Amino acid sequence: MGVNQPLGGNVTVTSLDKLVNWVRKSSIWPMTFGLACCAIEMMATGASHNDLDRFGIIFRASPRQADCIIIAGTVTKKMLPVIQTVYEQMPEPKWVIAMGACACSGGIFDTYSVVQGIDEALPVDVYIPGCPPRPEALLYGLMKLQDKIMQESNSFGSVFGLGERVSTV
């Protein structure tokens, strides 16, 4: 009884977490939220020269179709509730990228009306510094997000509400 011939290279053994994380990292759909000059660089990143499709990254215009939001530019206190509403409309699991000096730390605008970093309101997964960061920097940040997704554990259980996702990074 049993298998008479070895299976060879036809079988891959992995954990369910790694399989689900591989699928998630291979199909990141970021929602663009361009607030200032960083949005121009974000649009340049989406051009054919960079070919984000080869990484499974496709920009979406609806928060209900996106699993990542790229906050690109200056976040004002008047715009913050809109960003939070859009973030809440995104399905789980969801990730946040802060693109540019203004989104990361408020940039040069240390005034009463500017939020000093989007991490005051949302959990940021990847920070991309620069004023504005080049398209290559955004591409590198997206690849770092893919690495972070692969390190998460209990991702499959969170799909069914069995627990929260935990990053080991």
UniProtKB/Swiss-Prot annotation:
<keyword id="KW-0004">4Fe-4S</keyword>
<comment type="function">
    <text>NDH-1 shuttles electrons from NADH, via FMN and iron-sulfur (Fe-S) centers, to quinones in the respiratory chain. The immediate electron acceptor for the enzyme in this species is believed to be ubiquinone. Couples the redox reaction to proton translocation (for every two electrons transferred, four hydrogen ions are translocated across the cytoplasmic membrane), and thus conserves the redox energy in a proton gradient.</text>
</comment>
<keyword id="KW-0813">Transport</keyword>
<keyword id="KW-0520">NAD</keyword>
<dbReference type="GO" id="GO:0050136">
    <property type="term" value="F:NADH:ubiquinone reductase (non-electrogenic) activity"/>
</dbReference>
<dbReference type="GO" id="GO:0048038">
    <property type="term" value="F:quinone binding"/>
</dbReference>
<keyword id="KW-0411">Iron-sulfur</keyword>
<feature type="binding site">
    <location>
        <position position="131"/>
    </location>
    <ligand>
        <name>[4Fe-4S] cluster</name>
    </ligand>
</feature>
<dbReference type="GO" id="GO:0009060">
    <property type="term" value="P:aerobic respiration"/>
</dbReference>
<dbReference type="GO" id="GO:0005886">
    <property type="term" value="C:plasma membrane"/>
</dbReference>
<comment type="subunit">
    <text>NDH-1 is composed of 14 different subunits. Subunits NuoB, C, D, E, F, and G constitute the peripheral sector of the complex.</text>
</comment>
<dbReference type="GO" id="GO:0045271">
    <property type="term" value="C:respiratory chain complex I"/>
</dbReference>
<keyword id="KW-0408">Iron</keyword>
<comment type="similarity">
    <text>Belongs to the complex I 20 kDa subunit family.</text>
</comment>
<keyword id="KW-1003">Cell membrane</keyword>
<dbReference type="GO" id="GO:0051539">
    <property type="term" value="F:4 iron, 4 sulfur cluster binding"/>
</dbReference>
<keyword id="KW-0874">Quinone</keyword>
<feature type="binding site">
    <location>
        <position position="37"/>
    </location>
    <ligand>
        <name>[4Fe-4S] cluster</name>
    </ligand>
</feature>
<dbReference type="InterPro" id="IPR006137">
    <property type="entry name" value="NADH_UbQ_OxRdtase-like_20kDa"/>
</dbReference>
<keyword id="KW-0997">Cell inner membrane</keyword>
<dbReference type="Pfam" id="PF01058">
    <property type="entry name" value="Oxidored_q6"/>
</dbReference>
<dbReference type="GO" id="GO:0015990">
    <property type="term" value="P:electron transport coupled proton transport"/>
</dbReference>
<feature type="binding site">
    <location>
        <position position="102"/>
    </location>
    <ligand>
        <name>[4Fe-4S] cluster</name>
    </ligand>
</feature>
<feature type="binding site">
    <location>
        <position position="38"/>
    </location>
    <ligand>
        <name>[4Fe-4S] cluster</name>
    </ligand>
</feature>
<keyword id="KW-0479">Metal-binding</keyword>
<dbReference type="GO" id="GO:0008137">
    <property type="term" value="F:NADH dehydrogenase (ubiquinone) activity"/>
</dbReference>
<keyword id="KW-1278">Translocase</keyword>
<dbReference type="GO" id="GO:0005506">
    <property type="term" value="F:iron ion binding"/>
</dbReference>
<protein>
    <recommendedName>
        <fullName>NADH-quinone oxidoreductase subunit B</fullName>
        <ecNumber>7.1.1.-</ecNumber>
    </recommendedName>
</protein>
<keyword id="KW-0830">Ubiquinone</keyword>
<dbReference type="InterPro" id="IPR006138">
    <property type="entry name" value="NADH_UQ_OxRdtase_20Kd_su"/>
</dbReference>
<keyword id="KW-0472">Membrane</keyword>
